[in-house]
Design a protein with these regions (language model features):
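Phosphate-binding/catalytic loops
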Residues: 117-125
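Positively charged, polar, low-complexity stretches
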Residues: 1-111, 115
Length: 125
């Protein structure tokens, strides 16, 4: 990916982070193609946007927002996906429902209405 392309991705992510008060960071690695497709279909039905992102680009985008997202920097390791939704609990419900049949996705962290949550155990907040 060229530098211009990376800058465009960072700008787009920064816009999404700025314009959404709710987003979840999850690990969907180790899902096979069938499960990944099922997860994406479920996200589409529930009006949740799911995007796989590079950690370095996501961190740069986070730094460009006026939100306090520093607590989320440490979770940006390994495979990362970001989920955006209007309703603060929509991604959490989706993750819980999907995990009835699969071990993933695993919640890494979330930003909901100016509150930061870290770790999979926060799924029931």
């Amino acid at each position: 990916m060229k530098k211009e392309e990376k800058n465009q991705v960072v700008e787009a992510l920064a816009d999404q982070l700025t314009n959404n008060n709710n987003f979840y960071i999850a690990d969907i690695s180790e899902l096979n193609a069938e499960d990944t497709s099922a997860l994406r279909r479920l996200c589409f039905k529930r009006e949740v946007t799911l995007t796989v992102v590079k950690n370095t680009l996501l961190k740069k985008a986070m730094e460009q927002t006026d939100k306090d997202l520093e607590a989320l920097y440490d979770i940006l390791k390994g495979p990362t996906s970001i989920m955006f939704a209007e309703a603060g609990n929509a991604p959490a419900k989706l993750i819980k429902e999907f995990r009835k049949t699969s071990e993933r996705p695993i919640l890494k962290g979330a930003y909901i209405e100016e509150m930061t949550y870290i770790g999979d155990e926060q799924l029931d907040f």
